[in-house]
Amino acid sequence: HIQVLDGKTAVTHVDIVDGDRVFGKYEEGVLADFKLREQDISFIKKHDLAVTGIWGMIEDELPLISKEIPVAFDFANKFANPIVEKAIPYVTYAFFSFDEESRNEFRQKYHSMGLKEKENCMEQLKEFMKAMQQKGPKVIIATLGKNGSIGYDGNSWYRFGIIECKVVDTMGAGDSFIAGFLYGILNGLNVQDSMEAGAQNSAVTIGYQGAW
């Protein structure tokens, strides 16, 4: 089930520096005007889960979709993007990526929310996750690169490290973590074990060149 639109396909330019992906120019192409049709929404609602993200262009349809099925949303490292506040009330599983390149944007968002000052970045991240989880998500997860991941469900905190492996190309590590986590959740695993499933999946992906 796809939409075929006239125009250029969206393109992401990526460099690999010492095994780590560095994003460059993004050409939005036909995605600039992409909208879900009624038949697309009906198709999505037939499934167990809807998975989208910051560049998915379907935040306007989330109120409809989330009434029928759970929604997983990859906010990447775009903490200050307006889509975060727009989408978060309709998201069941929220994912953020906390990395060096997003520290300034994270601090900007953190201070704009009026959250309490904390002694270090990790404590600030936890305060942010608590505030975001209260806006709607059942579970919120932040991936931390080589430091693993952290999760919060409104009652408990969860931590999982990484699976030791040879790193060839980190492209797709976050996507693979999300896929593994959601596979675990859909198969009845708890949050902790689903985080491990995500880490296992990422470890396979980053062993391949150009895995995304």
What spans do the regions from the language model cover?
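Active-site donor-binding loop signature of nucleotide-sugar glycosyltransferases
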Residues: 26-28, 96-98, 162
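Acidic, amphipathic alpha-helical patches
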Residues: 40, 84, 167
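Conserved phosphate-binding/catalytic region of the ribokinase-like
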Residues: 107-212
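Structural motif
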Residues: 11-12, 20-23, 49, 70-71, ...
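Conserved beta-alpha-beta core of the PfkB/ribokinase-like small-molecule kinase fold
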Residues: 49-127, 146-149
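Structured loop/turn residues at beta-strand edges in well-structured enzyme cores
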Residues: 42-45, 89, 135
